[in-house]
């Protein structure tokens, strides 16, 4: 195992040269993949100094990242979820700034190969960032929901009931949608989306909005107990098109609401 670590450290030092193998002596500053030279670089270079002095800090940072990634969901903690979203929103501009700075620094020292890679990385990052905004704006145009700008949101479930529109972000397009009514509380995908409802308030259809289209799910079956306002309703795909999930007025008929174009 030690030999593997030495070989890995030597490889890193060979790639980055003076950055990771700046020796205090007058010896060469680049590593060769040989036993003695590599060991000398690993034991005396800046890499070991960095790990020895910053290993605890990196451990704390990685623990925070693991916690945010694993428990950054609304059902666990809204605070951790907010931290996760903040990190995801900041990553694009930070990466873009780093690639631009690296391109400038590489150009200053005439390392044109690395300059080319840095420019390519900056271009790819910028394109991906623009694509995120385009898809988010398209989704917001259909749903009028700020969940559209959630980096994890690929689709949004829209349910109209009691004269209001309720939304729930989804990671993908479901085959069918089940709405569950428990003691007057309406649940979708395990999340409570509305309260104070009865069996007469369940909609005839629900919608799932994507950046490119809106999918309509029609009610095909339900089982309800009126006395306790408890039951379920199941919806399946019926059509897709350029529909808006936001009905402007309550005076529209069900058919008019469905055909209300964006």
Swiss-Prot record:
This protein's name: Membrane protein
InterPro entries in alphabetical order: ALPHA_CORONA_M (IPR042551), M_CoV (IPR002574)
A GO CC annotation given for this chain: host cell Golgi membrane
Free-text function comment from the UniProt entry: Component of the viral envelope that plays a central role in virus morphogenesis and assembly via its interactions with other viral proteins.
Subcellular locations according to the entry: Virion membrane; Host Golgi apparatus membrane
Record membrane topology: Multi-pass membrane protein
Sequence ranges on the Intravirion membrane side: 69-77, 134-262
Keywords tagged on the record: Glycoprotein, Host Golgi apparatus, Host membrane, Membrane, Transmembrane, Transmembrane helix, Viral envelope protein, Viral matrix protein, Virion
Alphabetized GO MF terms: structural constituent of virion
Sequence intervals crossing the membrane: 48-68, 78-98, 113-133
Location of region: Interaction with N protein: 237-252
Virion surface topology ranges: 19-47, 99-112
Family classification: Belongs to the alphacoronaviruses M protein family.
Main location as per UniProt: virion
Subunit structure: Homomultimer. Interacts with envelope E protein in the budding compartment of the host cell, which is located between endoplasmic reticulum and the Golgi complex. Forms a complex with HE and S proteins. Interacts with nucleocapsid N protein. This interaction probably participates in RNA packaging into the virus.
